[in-house]
Amino acid sequence: MAEQVFQNFETLQLHAGYTPDPHTRSTAVPIYATSSYTFNDSAHGARLFGLKELGNIYSRLMNPTVDVFEKRIAALEGGIAAAATSSGQAAQFLTIATLAKAGDNIVASSHLYGGTYNQLNVLLPRFGIKTKFVRSGKLEDYAAAIDDQTRAIYVESMSNPDYVVPDFEGIAKIAHEHGIPLVVDNTLGAGGYYIRPIEHGADIVVHSATKWIGGHGTTIGGVIVDSGRFNWNKHSDRFPEMVEPSPSYHGLKYWEAFGPATFITRIRVEMLRDIGACLSPFSAQQLLLGIETLGLRAERHAQNTEKLSKYFESSPNVSWVLWPGSESHPTYSQAKKYLTRGFGAMLSIGVKGDASAGSKVVDGLKLVSNLANVGDAKSLAIHPWSTTHEQLSEDERLASGVTEDMIRISVGIEHVDDIIADFEQSFQKAYGS
């Protein structure tokens, strides 16, 4: 495909990264169900293992089906390359483990998905990597948190579940002034449809591909995208592993050999090699099928979410509505600036009543599913206080934007009138009105 000619999202989601293979001319991406690949000869194998030549060695490192998925996501996000992982949590862990080591820290917004907060706050400190959480969105607070051991700033493009949209350009400027990359979890950005963080200064983008990218609740997967814009050589004092001789490859210097692709190369040839959190070709094929309709789904998701938000704003059973497209949202001005193709596919509401009211409303839904996922074509709802953020302390939950009365809703592509009717009947059961 001549990707330099065809650059529109809806075209890239169907064609980027794949040309029919010369053997079968298959128009669909084949599933390469193989663990390993035959070398031309021993010398060829030696060149591959020594990174003197790029090619397939073992499917833990790369696989032709997975390769198409990686190239397609990189194209959609505007990066130079991508590496697929077994899950979004794996993508996040491998990214941070590549940037930081024992004794280092990262600076992160406190407005995060519960699993992310737990990984940063509980798991990574066991490896000697600490996180400094910034509760406000103030740029000066991000700057104040950075010290000589800081290796990245980490934010979500729309935080889950309170949909805070950060000032990407302002935070990126601060990160770059201090010689560190900005890492953005763009899961809620739907594969780059609602926002492409790289265009606003992000250096690395991660996704849970399980969500809108796959789009049908069938497959667990993650992906890391490298913008190729961060100069690791310039900031070698913070990132010596990017430029100094690597003990893994007989003194190979990544920056010297791979330049702008240094970070994503280390992800592949060190992290995927040593940690093994790779994506299977079967999962890659499922995710590729999802990507083909991503733009169409994302458009309908956003339309339905806006209409559902207006319904909730007029409901006597709802105390408040959190939706980034609402003028009452704390970061509406930033959402309006950065989310140019719709305000996403999620919203949260606060229901009236005691602490059990949220659970009662969720339990009364018939069409909307009560489960721990987002980004499905079907509508989903959950009570975060007692589920996704339950492992956090009360103070940590509040810092993440989670309250007892909150219901988080991932709005699907059903007819919006039916989604509204389902909430209406559940409110009737819970409140009698």
Swiss-Prot record:
What PROSITE patterns has UniProt attached to this entry?
CYS_MET_METAB_PP
Where is the chain membrane-spanning? none
Q: Mind telling me which InterPro entries this protein's record contains?
A: Cys/Met-Metab_PyrdxlP-dep_enz, Cys_met_metab_PP, OAc-hSer/O-AcSer_sulfhydrylase, PyrdxlP-dep_Trfase, PyrdxlP-dep_Trfase_major, PyrdxlP-dep_Trfase_small
One GO BP? transsulfuration
Applications: Fusaric acid is phytotoxic to plants such as cotton and banana. It has been shown to induce programmed cell death in plants. In addition to a mild toxicity to animals, fusaric acid exhibits acanthamoebicidal, antioomycete, and antimycobacterial activities.
Which Pfam families does the protein's record reference?
Answer: Cys_Met_Meta_PP
Q: In which pathway does it act?
A: Mycotoxin biosynthesis
Question: What GO CC annotations are associated with the protein?
Answer: cytoplasm
The EC number on file is 2.5.1.-
Biological role = Sulfhydrylase; part of the gene cluster that mediates the biosynthesis of fusaric acid, a mycotoxin with low to moderate toxicity to animals and humans, but with high phytotoxic properties. L-aspartate is suggested as fusaric acid amino acid precursor that is activated and further processed to O-acetyl-L-homoserine by cluster enzymes aspartate kinase FUB3 and homoserine O-acetyltransferase FUB5, as well as enzymes of the primary metabolism.
The record's section on PANTHER family has:
HOMOCYSTEINE/CYSTEINE SYNTHASE, HOMOCYSTEINE_CYSTEINE SYNTHASE
Q: Which NCBIfam families match?
A: OAH_OAS_sulfhy
> Which protein family is it in?
Belongs to the trans-sulfuration enzymes family.
Q: What is this protein called?
A: Sulfhydrylase FUB7
Give the organism, scientific name: Gibberella fujikuroi (strain CBS 195.34 / IMI 58289 / NRRL A-6831)
Gene name per UniProt:
FUB7
